[in-house]
């Protein structure tokens, strides 16, 4: 019984020490980075050149990165970020930075699809639909062309067809 009381007291004391340490050494996140991150589409597609939306938001705020690199966000996102950061964006900069737009069409080869649902579970925008053990399909209007589904398909039945055209 005394052992139980001693361990309970030590656990309580250790909990207080840990909570104090966590409070004292907490990291200070820039609130503007959080606001810009909330504006981004959170598709984690890496088309901007960063590994995800949070690193891109951090680069926009801290390193003055261009705000027109997010292809899924489009011109509405550029306007929203410019209003949050109180910067003027000339009309010519409202165009996404890539000279050639890539229109990716994602196709699932139904003869090779085993219905494992790995592609659907990793799709950041839920553009792949289908039930487990059944053939899946891609909703093209929601697909951002991030290629994450390609990495997780065990049968390599997903194909990306890239169409490139001048703006």
From Swiss-Prot:
GO cellular-component term (any): plasma membrane
Binding positions ([4Fe-4S] cluster 1): 45, 48, 53, 70
Record GO biological process: electron transport chain
Names of the cofactor(s): [4Fe-4S] cluster
Sorted UniProt keywords: 4Fe-4S, Cell inner membrane, Cell membrane, Electron transport, Iron, Iron-sulfur, Membrane, Metal-binding, Repeat, Translocase, Transport
Membrane as UniProt keyword: yes
Subunit note: The complex is composed of six subunits: RnfA, RnfB, RnfC, RnfD, RnfE and RnfG.
Name of the protein in question: Ion-translocating oxidoreductase complex subunit B
Native organism: Buchnera aphidicola subsp. Acyrthosiphon pisum (strain APS)
């Amino acid at each position: 019984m005394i052992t139980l009381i001693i361990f309970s007291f030590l656990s309580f004391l250790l909990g207080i020490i840990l909570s104090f340490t966590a409070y004292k050494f907490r990291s200070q996140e820039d609130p503007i980075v959080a606001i810009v991150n909330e504006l981004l589409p959170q598709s984690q597609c890496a088309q901007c050149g960063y590994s995800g939306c949070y690193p891109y938001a951090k680069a926009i705020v801290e390193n003055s990165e261009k705000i027109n690199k997010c292809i899924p966000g489009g011109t509405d996102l550029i306007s929203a970020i410019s209003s949050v950061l109180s910067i003027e964006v000339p009309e010519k900069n409202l165009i996404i930075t890539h000279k050639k737009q890539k229109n990716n069409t994602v196709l699932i080869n139904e003869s090779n699809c085993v219905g494992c649902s790995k592609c659907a579970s990793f799709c950041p925008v839920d553009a792949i639909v289908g039930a487990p053990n059944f053939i899946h399909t891609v909703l093209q209007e929601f697909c951002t062309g991030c290629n994450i589904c390609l990495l997780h398909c065990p049968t390599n039945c997903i194909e990306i067809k890239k169409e490139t055209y001048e703006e």
